[in-house]
Amino acid sequence: MTNIRKTHPLIKIVNHSFIDLPTPSNISAWWNFGSLLGLCLIVQIVTGLFLAMHYTSDTMTAFSSVTHICRDVNYGWLIRYMHANGASMFFICLFLHVGRGLYYGSYTYFETWNIGVILLFTVMATAFMGYVLPWGQMSFWGATVITNLLSAIPYIGTTLVEWIWGGFSVDKATLTRFFAFHFVLPFIIAALAMVHLLFLHETGSNNPSGLISDSDKIPFHPYFSIKDTLGFLILILIFMTLVLFTPDLLGDPDNYTPANPLNTPPHIKPEWYFLFAYAILRSIPNKLGGVLALLFSILILMLFPILHMSKQRSMMFRPLSQCLFWILVADLFTLTWIGGQPVEYPFITIGQVASILYFSIILILLPFASLLENKLLKW
């Protein structure tokens, strides 16, 4: 008798994706982040669903409803902090996942990579709208500042901003629609993640050497299912340590003050995972220029397949490119630090230098280093 796992129309899809999937035998722990992102998404959807049962998206009661969740709902504090810190874990895994893709040349799978960049944008939009929902000071002013950036678009800017707001300022209409979008987007993310996997399984996984590994593949289960489970346990350990010991470590104290349109906080800044983009935005004195730089700082990822000049796929055997890659990582840390600092000397200058370096490495230095390596390695 044939195995139902291999014949049933639905179960066989799962089988080909997670059980009998041919996987390169040499993929390292850097390949764990895809499954960790799946775990983060499940945690966020489940905790978010329970929060939505108690939350009210009204300017008068939103802040109080979050307080009610933390004080009166059974384990509400746990659900709330898991959801808030779950976003941070999500972005840590996302950045490491993208970094792995850049280092090992995974971007040569065009479709998988481009869907991944769209996923990154969608997750960022979802996180931004989620940050507005508790209706604290930083929620309100963050929403005001970031949505206001759209007014830099010539001709239609102001109309567009008022259309998004649903009025002449961030108010009840804005909060309600942000809640609606924040609720629905994770399900769209889940659908996009399935498309991401679909395209990945068309080509098969990349591996650290960047070479074709068809001759050396092993089944996903039990080898990599066990490896992924270890990753899950490590992630849960770090995540729950953060949630149970220092739940407010990555948050902003200003968000414990209810939103007040008449009182601006001294330093308006987004959550830590947006600070690098915020620093790039602030480093350009022109409003439209800043908005374009902000957009391009993420969209630039889509150019990587075009800018790949090396005759080798991975950076594993390319020391010059490796060096530039780690300078880029250090530069992103610098930008993240600058994004959280006040707009004054010397932070403005450091931010501008770091922003120029960010775009220079990606657009000029990496392609040039790749061509040089081709010459040096006699390709």
Curated annotation (Swiss-Prot):
Keywords: Electron transport, Heme, Iron, Membrane, Metal-binding, Mitochondrion, Mitochondrion inner membrane, Respiratory chain, Transmembrane, Transmembrane helix, Transport, Ubiquinone
CDD domains on file: cytochrome_b_C, Cytochrome_b_N
Binding, heme b b566: 97, 196
Gene Ontology CC terms: mitochondrial inner membrane; respiratory chain complex III
Positions with a binding annotation for heme b b562: 83, 182
Chain positions recorded as a ubiquinone binding sites: 201
InterPro entries: Cyt_b/b6_C, Cyt_b/b6_C_sf, Cyt_b/b6_N, Cytb/b6-like_sf, Cytochrome_b, Cytochrome_b_C_euk/bac, Cytochrome_b_N_euk/bac, Di-haem_cyt_TM
GO MF: metal ion binding; ubiquinol-cytochrome-c reductase activity
Topology versus the membrane: Multi-pass membrane protein
Pfam family, one: Cytochrome_B
Principal localisation: mitochondrion
Subcellular location: Mitochondrion inner membrane
Transmembrane segments: 33-53, 77-98, 113-133, 178-198, 226-246, 288-308, 320-340, 347-367
Note: Heme 1 (or BL or b562) is low-potential and absorbs at about 562 nm, and heme 2 (or BH or b566) is high-potential and absorbs at about 566 nm.
Oligomeric and partner information: The cytochrome bc1 complex contains 11 subunits: 3 respiratory subunits (MT-CYB, CYC1 and UQCRFS1), 2 core proteins (UQCRC1 and UQCRC2) and 6 low-molecular weight proteins (UQCRH/QCR6, UQCRB/QCR7, UQCRQ/QCR8, UQCR10/QCR9, UQCR11/QCR10 and a cleavage product of UQCRFS1). This cytochrome bc1 complex then forms a dimer.
Annotated protein name in UniProt: Cytochrome b
Gene source species: Glaucomys sabrinus (Northern flying squirrel)
Organism placement in taxonomy: Eukaryota, Metazoa, Chordata, Craniata, Vertebrata
Gene: MT-CYB
